A protein has these predicted regions:
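Helix-to-loop junction immediately C-terminal to a conserved catalytic motif
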Residues: 6
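Conserved ABC transporter NBD signature motif
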Residues: 14-27
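ABC-family P-loop ATPase nucleotide-binding domains
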Residues: 36-93
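Catalytic Walker B motif of ABC-type/P-loop ATPase nucleotide-binding domains
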Residues: 105-109, 114
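Helix N-cap at the start of a conserved alpha-helix in ABC-type nucleotide-binding domains
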Residues: 116-118
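Conserved H-loop
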Residues: 134-143
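ABC ATPase "signature
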Residues: 165-166
Length: 201
């Protein structure tokens, strides 16, 4: 869905619009920024040069803020993008997303490869950014528990179908996390909509 919104994939059917404009139009694409798992910059480009490039394509890109984030995350600006670890590759893309200042910022699995400290820092910066520069931020993640307190509205999608679409507070009030012996848990869950299961041992 996020790739369709940002024009990277074409829908099989139907239409997608951003503020009334077709999603693949310049008017729509200029309002959107996708922080995905893939790096879209040349691999041998240095982080510093990538920030310069972002500023060209996104007029409201805050270069000084991006550099301050790089300092907080300890991301070296003179390092080539292909020399970054998985975690620091994610951090590089997160910094772009937090600094771009478009009306809509889409984060697809944003904390991939990040350790707990860097995940916490990202979530803190996400809230801070929203407070200072309100915009629509979409976070697509499997780590629901980590973002539940940050998200106002939740859409749960499985295999292309919307299972739930409601305010987060309303959804969490109607959900349970159940643990115990497998047989007892399976018995309790029978007939209920199970979102995910984890087996230990």
């Amino acid at each position: 869905l996020l790739n369709i919104l940002t024009g990277r994939l074409c829908p099989d059917s139907g239409t997608v619009a951003v503020d009334g404009a077709p999603a693949d139009s310049d008017a729509a694409l200029g309002k959107l920024f996708l922080v995905g798992e893939k790096n879209l910059y040349p691999d041998d480009m240095k982080v510093k040069r990538a920030l310069d490039t972002a500023a060209v394509f996104y007029p409201d890109f805050d270069r000084s803020y991006a550099e301050s984030l790089a300092k907080q995350f300890e991301l070296p600006l003179n390092k080539k993008i292909n020399g970054l670890s998985t975690g620091y590759g994610s951090i590089f893309r997160l910094i772009l997303g937090l600094s771009v200042n478009t009306p809509y910022v889409l984060f697809d699995e944003p904390v991939l490869g990040l350790d707990a400290q860097h995940r916490d820092l990202f979530y803190k910066l996400l809230v801070q950014k929203y407070a200072e520069h309100p915009c629509t931020m979409v976070v697509s993640t499997h780590l629901i528990a980590e973002v539940a307190d940050l998200i106002e509205h939740t859409v749960i999608i499985r295999k292309g179908r919307i299972l739930q679409d409601a305010p987060t507070e309303e959804l969490t009030a109607a959900c349970w996390a159940v643990s115990g012996p497998a047989g007892l848990v399976d018995g309790w869950a029978a007939g209920r909509n199970v979102l995910t299961t984890t087996a230990l041992g």
